[in-house]
């Protein structure tokens, strides 16, 4: 759960890891499928506090934000707005699958589909907020033809270039 106790424990482990490695590490926001009743703060606040207290950076997975937002009913754009700009050092994009059942549906971060239009929109917002951050598209299963992968990468590059042109 996202509690002060869990944060204290994780900060200590992140600091220990960074001390052993002699360098900063990045922590990735997860995709989530359940919520803890005991949580005292939202994920984005926990992540920002972890980075601030430990000095680690954040690998911001935009697809994970979208998946979790859909699964739990929060505003994905609001998540981006509260993450401090300096802590984001890498961005991930991916695809997901929708599992339907009697009472609804759940999105699963499967890395086997193209990036969906809503995630591209969220990525555009992320680039507007955080700038030209190195971006990786994850595709681990049901890998398509190279042309599909290249097209996804080119779309991400175009969004980054658009941001660069605006900043110039």
Could you say what each language-model-derived stretch is?
Residues 134-140:
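Conserved active-site loop/cleft motifs that coordinate metal ions or position small ligands
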Residues 4-7, 71-130:
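Gly/Pro-rich active-site loop or hairpin
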Residues 30-32, 63-67, 93-98, 140-142:
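Active-site beta-loop-alpha junctions enriched in small/polar residues
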Residues 25, 61, 91, 135:
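Conserved, mostly hydrophobic/aromatic
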Residues 146-167:
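C-terminal helical cap(s) of enzyme catalytic domains, especially alpha/beta-barrels
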Residues 35-52, 68-81, 147-150:
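Distinct, well-ordered alpha-helical segments
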Residues 1-57:
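Active-site acidic/histidine proton-transfer and metal-coordination neighborhood
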Residues 10-18, 44-51, 80, 120-127, ...:
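Generic structural signal for well-ordered alpha-helices
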């Amino acid at each position: 759960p996202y509690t002060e106790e869990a944060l204290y424990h994780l900060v200590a482990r992140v600091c220990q890891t960074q001390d052993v490695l002699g360098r900063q590490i990045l922590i990735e926001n997860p995709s989530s499928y359940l919520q803890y009743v005991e949580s005292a703060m939202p994920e984005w606040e926990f992540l920002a506090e972890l980075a601030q207290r430990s000095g680690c950076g954040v690998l911001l997975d935009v697809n994970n934000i979208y998946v979790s937002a859909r699964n739990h009913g929060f505003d994905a754009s609001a998540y981006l707005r509260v993450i401090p700009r300096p802590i984001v050092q890498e961005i991930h994009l991916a695809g997901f699958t929708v599992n339907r059942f009697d009472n609804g549906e759940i999105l699963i971060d499967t890395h086997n589909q193209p990036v969906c239009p809503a995630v591209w929109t969220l990525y555009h917002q992320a680039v507007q907020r955080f700038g030209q951050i190195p971006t990786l598209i994850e595709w681990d299963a049901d890998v398509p033809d190279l042309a599909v992968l290249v097209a996804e990468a080119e779309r991400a590059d175009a969004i980054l270039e658009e941001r660069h042109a605006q900043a110039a």
